[in-house]
């Protein structure tokens, strides 16, 4: 099993979600996150002074899937979230050792 974590632009969430549902993804975790990187943020004015805001709001989605679906799901996320501009986000892929559904004690794929 793999965990895919994708940091995307907030306005791309619905498009990504719909694309993932089309690929058979039945659920995901969505988290509001903030961070900085190459996008550099923006400059705003307040009472005549300029302020640099370098922490940008993003959305992080997490999905647990079987190893054989990773490449297709990564392609789907990229296609649905890409604008071609700095700040489109990142995708992280990691191994998951075990999943347990708390209510039923189901394990691994039965728990998803």
From Swiss-Prot:
InterPro entries reported in the protein's UniProt record: N-reg_PII, N-reg_PII-like_a/b, N-reg_PII/ATP_PRibTrfase_C, N-reg_PII_CS, N-reg_PII_urydylation_site
Listed PROSITE patterns: PII_GLNB_CTER, PII_GLNB_DOM, PII_GLNB_UMP
Main localization, broad class: plastid
Keywords: Chloroplast, Nucleotide-binding, Phosphoprotein, Plastid, Transcription, Transcription regulation
Origin superkingdom: Eukaryota
Localization annotation: Plastid, Chloroplast
Subunit composition and interactions: Homotrimer.
Family: Belongs to the P(II) protein family.
Protein purpose: P-II indirectly controls the transcription of the glutamine synthetase gene (glnA). P-II prevents NR-II-catalyzed conversion of NR-I to NR-I-phosphate, the transcriptional activator of glnA. When P-II is uridylylated to P-II-UMP, these events are reversed. When the ratio of Gln to 2-ketoglutarate decreases, P-II is uridylylated to P-II-UMP, which causes the deadenylation of glutamine synthetase, so activating the enzyme.
Protein name (database record): Nitrogen regulatory protein P-II
